[in-house]
């Protein structure tokens, strides 16, 4: 067994059954191609690498053969690899991904020049209608060249999708492996949320006691991030509003931050999305803030808490499909369902996701999902798997 087989599908099966041709060109970012290939495999893809002569000066074909477990194409020969892999045949590849892609290769593809294995693959893919994604990487002066920008626009008009580089100093750096992978999943996925605008509100709010101390809830923000990623993968227009959190938020997910409940309530007026999900750990109580810092040598400190307004009430005034979340602790399954249903009725929610905190551990969870239409189901698994199941129920509700 080749080592690449041991990592297949270990993160998800989102790309299971998908064949991806990975074009590698002569950018120093070619060193990232090994990890990119393996990340695609971890999500279930079969990857075949195609390399230009210039890329072979940076990494070897043996490197990419190890990464993919497949023979690497460095020349087009009697097997007419460009036709057999990307021609007009039923078993052709599902995607040509060129990452990294140089200014030279971008311009050649735009001009219909195919004098390298990668550009020949691109010419064939364009002619046969195979999707193409390009992730540029180069010096910023090259990326800003008006002819390069014109060629990018031309290729975009042909339906080729560009994964924008990160601009850092004088470099247009290759997008992260995570972003490229997520965008590939989005392109090849079910696209069942295409045209839908989804807002996810996550993390925890924090109410200031003084200039130093706060009252907050426990919450990592992981569930919100996983739902945002799942919606992104399914072609939704996603926005994430995040309070305090301890997880990394992907840079390619459009994000706004809030601190206090008052901050969030002020933002509610901006909501114009079709669907809103609120897996946030929001404060139930607020406290009147003391200016400065309360002395730490006091033997006793009394705080007067007052009930906080419910954000769901404000959001409900918007014309959107609204799913709330309800966390309980140490309750029976029947009690969990009863309390969740009561919350759903109280705030006129379209659906609610409930869980017992005892069922939550790092990376995994168990939830019960119910909707106003009377559907109810309980699902368990990784937070990524559960995020997709939540979206399945949202889709079932709106269709």
Model-predicted segments: where are they?
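A cross-family phosphate/adenosyl-ligand binding-site feature
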Residues: 1-399
